């Protein structure tokens, strides 16, 4: 049944990502949904069989190199594979040096230099992006100016250091899998995980990017390991004060480096007290969540506000999806709106209702909703009008949401990459037969914002343009090579592999334990909340690399979850306490 549901979702998402409607639900749709569902069932069963295969336990003394490696202290066992991974990443690091500046990063740095961005007054810092990221990137630029007379120099060093640190962290993830899983299978899973992290170029390409999401990943990876250990030991890991303090520190840093990271981190921490454990242990977990929320939502904002001129934005980002639905309603039913509803919409949004149909872009909310609201006090009135209109024509809302978020579920997408205007539905239908595969798209060349271009010492980095073209060619090779290109599909990471994890959870022995366990797989909470957070984004189809940037955390989180699942001990997850070696 799960595979059939997945087939229906993918078929509907393919329609939404190519023609901006879920239907038509005709015979072709049924055949495609059944075909995808059957294929997924076969693949999932094969994957399950591979995961259940007993790993071979080899005697260490038969491999002298392995024996010497295992005799090393922990630091050696961590750094030696990290050096191997870094050596494999080095060619990409070289061709992408000095790192990619993203559009948003340029705005953040420009603000640190007192240049106006996002319509905010010059000299102020906008809260449109996480303040910690702005402080980090701006301080690095200032450091480069002070030490080398060029702000780009410190950012280039930062990009390389970011890659080095990530190699160490990913190696630590592999060592953790090898330590906590069943003997034999755990080592095989760890080796497979290490090979993926080492050879798949998406990770190193992204880590050579200077952007808030790559900084976030630096804290997310070790936080995931601590979260998994806390869940695996049924909260007993929190008995260690050093572990608990480190967990809180990483939770705070993970939460402060992306907007969605704040909610994902705190909501995940709130799941830990639900674990079947002692009352004292649950209180410790609740304390971790409470302290993290207090620091990230009250202490840090107050401290930054006292030190810098921060311009706090209204909550326009919370209305991205509702306003996109309103725009689709304006396109489908322009005459079926009351004067009161029209006034409520026009009061809140800069784009009036009468212009929404023309500006509507099925795969991008930016043309409809701006960086701010016209009158934030009218949000309540707007939401009431929005609800009434949705009850009147729910089909428009469903198609608007499906099109906007279809990129997380679809295998195909429209070949159009237009972002500076609205797109008519007849345009999409006219080129639906040229649909392209929905693949991860990277920002490799610099994306320079107008504010960043105004910096007096800014100069385009053309010296490395030839090398960066080789980075594009490398990713193009992976996108076009049979078998390898499957790994470049967005939906593989944001829907299909998570669906496989759910498939494993519902199958024996997990299925029999769901009634007895509060959280049979508590360590999956970050994955669940992260996936749900994707559904509030203003773009999912990669018309521009921003869409792919939102999901690149999945390239670490999903393989980590798969490795834990493949190497889990034979004891039930209800008895995982005490599994550590």
What is each stretch, according to the model?
Residues 1-4, 25-91, 522, 568-574, ...:
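Start-transfer (signal-anchor) and selected internal transmembrane alpha helices
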Residues 96-110, 120-140, 148-153, 553:
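Extracytoplasmic catalytic/substrate-binding loops of multi-pass membrane glycan-assembly enzymes
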């Amino acid at each position: 049944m799960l595979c059939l549901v997945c087939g229906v979702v993918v078929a509907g998402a393919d329609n939404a990502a190519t023609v901006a409607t879920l239907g038509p639900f005709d015979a072709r749709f049924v055949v495609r949904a059944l075909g995808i569902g059957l294929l997924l069932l076969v693949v999932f069963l094969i994957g399950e069989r591979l995961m259940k295969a007993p790993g071979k336990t080899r005697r260490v003394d038969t491999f002298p190199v392995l024996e010497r490696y295992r005799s090393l202290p922990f630091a050696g066992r961590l750094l030696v594979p990290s050096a191997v991974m870094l050596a494999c990443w080095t060619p990409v690091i070289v061709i992408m040096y000095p790192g990619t500046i993203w559009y948003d990063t340029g705005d953040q740095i420009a603000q640190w230099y007192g240049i106006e961005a996002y319509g905010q007054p010059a000299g102020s810092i906008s809260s449109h992006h996480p303040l910690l990221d702005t402080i980090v990137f701006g301080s690095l630029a200032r450091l480069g100016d002070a030490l080398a007379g060029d702000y780009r120099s410190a950012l280039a060093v930062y990009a390389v250091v970011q890659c080095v640190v990530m190699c160490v962290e990913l190696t630590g993830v592999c060592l953790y899998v090898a330590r906590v899983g069943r003997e034999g299978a755990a080592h095989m899973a760890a080796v497979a995980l290490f090979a993926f992290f080492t050879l798949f170029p998406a990770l190193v390409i992204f880590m050579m990017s200077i952007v808030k999401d790559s900084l976030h990943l630096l804290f997310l990876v070790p936080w995931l390991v601590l979260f998994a250990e806390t869940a695996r030991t049924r909260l007993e890991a929190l008995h260690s004060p050093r572990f608990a303090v480190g967990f809180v520190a990483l939770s705070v840093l993970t939460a402060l480096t992306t907007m969605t990271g704040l909610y994902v981190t705190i909501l995940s921490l709130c799941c830990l007290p639900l674990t079947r454990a002692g009352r004292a242990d649950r209180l410790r977990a609740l304390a971790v969540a409470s302290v993290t929320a207090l620091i990230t939502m009250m202490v840090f904002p107050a401290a930054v506000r006292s030190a810098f001129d921060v311009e706090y934005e209204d909550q326009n980002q919370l209305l991205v999806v509702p306003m996109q639905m309103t725009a689709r309603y304006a396109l489908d039913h322009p005459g079926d709106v009351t004067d009161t509803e029209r006034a409520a919409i026009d009061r809140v949004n800069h784009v009036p209702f009468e212009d929404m149909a023309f500006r509507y872009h099925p795969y991008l909310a930016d043309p409809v909703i701006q960086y701010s609201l016209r009158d934030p006090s009218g949000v309540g009135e707007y939401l009431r009008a929005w609800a009434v209109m949705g009850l009147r024509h729910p089909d428009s809302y469903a198609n608007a949401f499906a099109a906007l978020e279809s990129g997380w579920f679809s295998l195909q997408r429209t070949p159009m990459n237009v972002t500076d205007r609205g797109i008519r539905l007849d345009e999409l239908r006219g080129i639906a037969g040229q649909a392209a595969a929905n693949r991860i798209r990277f920002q490799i060349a610099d994306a320079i914002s107008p504010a960043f271009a105004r910096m007096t010492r800014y100069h385009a980095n053309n010296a490395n343009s030839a090398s960066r073209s080789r980075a594009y060619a490398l990713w193009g090779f992976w996108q076009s090579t049979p078998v390898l290109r499957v790994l470049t599909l967005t939906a593989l990471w944001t829907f299909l592999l998570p669906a496989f994890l759910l498939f494993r959870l519902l199958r024996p022995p997990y299925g029999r334990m769901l009634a007895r366990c509060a959280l049979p797989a508590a360590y999956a909470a970050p994955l669940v909340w992260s996936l749900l957070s994707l559904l509030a984004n203003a773009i999912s189809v990669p018309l521009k690399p921003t869409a792919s940037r939102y999901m690149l955390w999945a390239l670490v989180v999903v393989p980590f979850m798969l490795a834990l699942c493949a190497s889990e001990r034979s004891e039930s997850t209800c008895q995982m306490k005490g599994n550590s070696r």
